[in-house]
């Protein structure tokens, strides 16, 4: 540490002591803030806050103000009860919930936390990157999540993802599905720029849909876990969400190359190949949730909205200051 000139030896000693105290105090404050942030980020569900006991159609969201999972309840103050675990992304189905939780510090690291219906921790997996997408199959047996490895937005050209699949029946974890054999345009595709994200599962816990990006284009892929294979079905489909009857896919479609609202929410009929936009006119960047066979829920502008899947009607706000919608249904 350089010592100022023009001061007496005694004054110079006091200046050094004061500087050390200030540095030490700053380090202590940083440590306390980091510890406090870690405790908040790692907060578990309150006793009695579970997915059981709620009506099957009850909506759960991530409450932005607290960072915790909340049950939407019009009779509660603020319209919700935020007593769940702290998560950056949350999804639940069957007897399982999945909480993606970012850890404080640099470089970015996170946890994938598997929970039961009482929101008690079953398994915790440390991950590099930033939480992006989370999905649980309808049975609760198979889970998938996507992390940003570099970058923090799908709108950027310089992003990379890692998508994992966990089978709770066997405990087997695929840390990154990028090595799955991919058929694109009728041929086996090999490229170093392959990225997958936005996995959604069919009812058989084997077939899945996802987005693959390669060569500057995005494609909808249909995957087979048992045969460990994937094939591209069509271009310009991101974050697919399969309808409860397995006949349609809600997805975000790029409609603009600009950074402002580049995606719109669409629905694809798998049998006919026809697609149509829903009545949401604003751009979205989310993996939509089917709340029933006719309705979609999704995050937009810091709130959770719903809209009919057939293109009729108009968007309706479900929860302000919220994201990551999911249902309590088994």
Predicted regions located by residue number:
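Sequence signature of WD/YWTD-type beta-propeller architectures
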Residues: 2-330
């Amino acid at each position: 540490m350089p010592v100022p000139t023009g001061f007496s030896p005694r004054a110079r000693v006091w200046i050094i002591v004061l500087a050390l105290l200030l540095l030490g105090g700053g380090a202590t404050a940083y440590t306390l803030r980091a510890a406090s942030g870690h405790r908040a980020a790692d907060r578990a569900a309150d006793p009695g806050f579970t997915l059981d006991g709620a009506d099957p159609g009850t909506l759960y969201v991530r409450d932005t103000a607290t960072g915790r999972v909340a049950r939407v309840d019009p009779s509660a103050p603020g319209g919700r009860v935020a007593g769940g675990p702290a998560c950056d992304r949350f999804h639940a189905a069957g007897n399982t919930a999945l909480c993606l939780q970012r850890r404080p510090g640099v470089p970015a690291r996170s946890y994938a936390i598997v929970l039961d219906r009482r929101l008690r921790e079953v398994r915790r997996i440390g991950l590099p990157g930033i939480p992006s997408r989370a999905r649980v199959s309808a049975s609760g047996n198979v889970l998938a999540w996507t992390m940003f490895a570099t970058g923090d937005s799908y709108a950027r050209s310089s992003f990379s993802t890692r998508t994992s699949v966990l089978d709770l029946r066997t405990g087997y974890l695929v840390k990154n599905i990028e090595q799955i054999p991919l058929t694109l345009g009728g041929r086996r595709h090999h490229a170093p720029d392959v990225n997958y994200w936005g996995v959604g599962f069919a009812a058989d816990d084997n077939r899945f849909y996802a987005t693959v990006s390669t060569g500057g284009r995005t494609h909808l892929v249909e995957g087979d876990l048992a045969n460990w294979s994937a094939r591209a079905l069509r271009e310009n489909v991101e974050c697919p969400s399969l309808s409860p009857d397995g006949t349609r896919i809600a997805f975000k479609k790029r409609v603009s190359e600009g950074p402002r609202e580049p995606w719109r929410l669409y629905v694809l009929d798998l049998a006919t190949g026809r697609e149509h936009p829903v009545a949401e006119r604003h751009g979205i960047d989310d993996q939509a949730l089917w709340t029933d066979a006719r309705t979609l829920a999704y995050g937009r502008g810091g709130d959770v909205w719903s809209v009919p899947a057939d293109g009729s009607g108009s968007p309706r706000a479900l929860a302000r200051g919220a994201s990551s919608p999911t249902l309590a249904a088994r």
